[in-house]
Amino acid sequence: MIRVVVVDDSMSMRTLLERIINGCDGMTCVGAAEDASAAREMIRALDPDVVTLDVEMPGMDGLEFLRRMMLLKPTPTIMVSGRTTSGSDAALRALELGAVDVIAKPLLTRPADLADYARDIAELIRGAAAARVKGGALAAASSAGRERACAHRPRGAKKAGIAATRLSRVIAIGASTGGTEALRTVLQDMSGTPPPILICQHMPEGFTASFAARLDAICGIRVKEAEQGEPLHYGCAYVAPGHSHLSLAATGRLYVCRLEASPPVNRHRPSVDVLFDSVARLAGKRALGAILTGMGKDGAAGLLRMRASGARTFAQDEPSCVVFGMPKEAIAMGAVDEILPLARMGARLSEALQ
């Protein structure tokens, strides 16, 4: 049984989360706190498996509480964020501090919204319960490293390289739980001016633009949220927006982004399988595919199709994953050429382009 503590200053949100958690098989809400002080005592006394934490609370906010908790008692934590720009920025900062995942507060504008939200929360809690949490000095060192990288990166707008054509190489990367930090590591470790990189990271709508901007600030290449029909360029990474599937497409000789707000695939939109399938069809042996940390199986079948089309494929190894789900499924299917620790992935992708 997964034991969960809910921390939120809104009584209605606490009640909703308690009801959802207690209605799911295999999990129970053992406590609900309205502020950081109550949460600290509750977590100390109840020792939960997972914490859901409101980003924006009066007094000590969710970020400061998370920072202290990760130093003293690292616990898998899901950030529950408002749908504002400030809320999404804070949630992404929480992922840097060691939170496992983030979910937006529900809109509940349709009767089906509650069931969808309950399903999403339950999936995140199960993933968090299986996660390896990086707390204490490790989280602090990781955060400090990002700040140093940002401080020492040359200032000024980064220019994209030449446009990519149908003869160009392409890199496709998929990730879920733990992927925000894994992607940062991979992109920072790549050398030179790589071919276009298409990224599918499972993330709610409203968060991906901020995520891309944060990566852009600390990486040597340009990173942006993908836009419909935009040509792909060398030295640029394109992040799938949270509202649409991202596919590789072509207009004439040029590679472009295709966005489609079609139904979820493997319960995800954007879906890694959708991205990988499009790259397999269009780029074939000129592509590289990598599947990183994450819960579930999204991307495994698509990576197999990439490999069958001649692409070189890679998976993150179990010890370095936050959740060894998606890579495990891909490996079991025979979709993977090389299994690598995260610390080697970026450099190996660069080597494979030679």
From Swiss-Prot:
InterPro entries assigned to the protein according to its UniProt record, in alphabetical order: CheB-like (IPR008248), CheB_C (IPR035909), CheY-like_superfamily (IPR011006), Sig_transdc_resp-reg_Me-estase (IPR000673), Sig_transdc_resp-reg_receiver (IPR001789)
Domain CheB-type methylesterase: 164-354
Active site: 176, 202, 298
The organism's taxonomic lineage, starting at the top: Bacteria, Pseudomonadati, Pseudomonadota, Betaproteobacteria, Burkholderiales
SUPFAM superfamilies, alphabetized: CheY-like, Methylesterase CheB, C-terminal domain
Name of the protein described by the UniProt record: Protein-glutamate methylesterase/protein-glutamine glutaminase 2
Top-level taxon in the UniProt lineage: Bacteria
The keyword Hydrolase belongs to this UniProt entry's keyword annotation: yes
Residues carrying 4-aspartylphosphate: 54
Single annotated GO MF: protein-glutamine glutaminase activity
Organism: Burkholderia thailandensis (strain ATCC 700388 / DSM 13276 / CCUG 48851 / CIP 106301 / E264)
Catalytic activity from the UniProt record: [protein]-L-glutamate 5-O-methyl ester + H2O = L-glutamyl-[protein] + methanol + H(+); L-glutaminyl-[protein] + H2O = L-glutamyl-[protein] + NH4(+)
EC number per UniProt: 3.1.1.61, 3.5.1.44
Annotated TM spans: none
Single Gene Ontology BP annotation: chemotaxis
Cellular component, GO, one term: cytoplasm
Family to which this protein belongs: Belongs to the CheB family.
Domain Response regulatory: start-end pairs: 3-120
